[in-house]
Amino acid sequence: MNARLALFALFLLVVACQARYHNTPNRLVNVIISKIYGSFDQESSVEPRRRHVPTDEYDDSDESTEDKAPVHRIVSAIEGSDESDEVEVVQPSRYLRRPCLIKRKNRRYNFVKSYPRPWEHPGFEASIPKEWDWRNVSGVNYCSPNRNQHIPVYCGSCWVFGSTGALNDRFNVARKNRWPQTMVSPQEIIDCNGKGSCQGGDVADVYEHAKKEGLVEEGCNNYKAVNEKCTPFNRCGSCWPDNCFAIQNYTRYFIKDWGQVQGRENMMAEIQSRGPIACSIGATPKFDLNYTGGIYTEKSNLTSNHIVSVSGWGVDKETNTEFWIVRNSWGEAWGERGWFRIVTSTYLNGQGNDFNMGIETDCYFADPDISNLD
């Protein structure tokens, strides 16, 4: 008898599963399914098949529901499926709930300044050109390749990629684009900086590490998007078929002066003179999900939560709108092949800072030390 009941229960479970995933219109089966899976939407007798696609590797288990940000859902058809099939992209406001930029309270930044900045000279504004783009200076590109911080798994490492993206380019500028072009390792910084991690960090975590210990090139420790221990092997290592080992002699990339710069004209002078800079922005879900190209504007007042690198500026010929040229770290599939443009503070007769996610309020520069490279 027990065996028959077990077989009957198994049969009902199989039928229920088939009905749930093949939209079988059977009221009795729906009742069975509701007992097993819970009730359906009241507006539909059979719930359309949904796949939950997580867009943030985020563990909610240790948080109360009161601390959670709203969940934004976007529903679209699955390619190649029936009309009733839908994919539900569960999009948490990751930058509001867990920003990849973490500003620690009462932290003292160890800025280094041994010579005046370009924007500290009287009358510097007169020499600022109308347009500047380090991707194309007289036909020469000084910018390093675009990266994706979110592969092979999600990692809140924008603080690394925004900072090193600008710094890679500055090494190329300082060395006049001579071979080899610079590509420092974000993973080594995550492993060995001592502060930031895949749960977030700060520009200072990168530049203080570069000043004190020096950075290593990408081939020393390829990006894995995880938190690892700082070992000699994770500093710079390699492997043979039968063993792995730490490399003893490798190039280190140091910086000299580093500090903060704010404001449109100061930023322009710093960028034109020495190369791209790292800037914080208050990234919004709309920017994250909807930007595909063009000059971005959005009125918002979010706290800074993301780091990007600003490589130049320009003016739209049709609208005469001035914009920043910015590299993100979400891969080439996002935006304008991984880049975006956003209005400067001149937008709407000087109201642009309300529409550009605060990109001009908190930026950082670092001057490469190339004395050991050439």
Question: Each predicted region: which residue ranges?
Answer:
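Cleavable N-terminal signal peptides of Sec/SRP-targeted secreted and luminal proteins
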Residues: 3-19
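Catalytic-core signature of thiol
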Residues: 16-63, 67-374
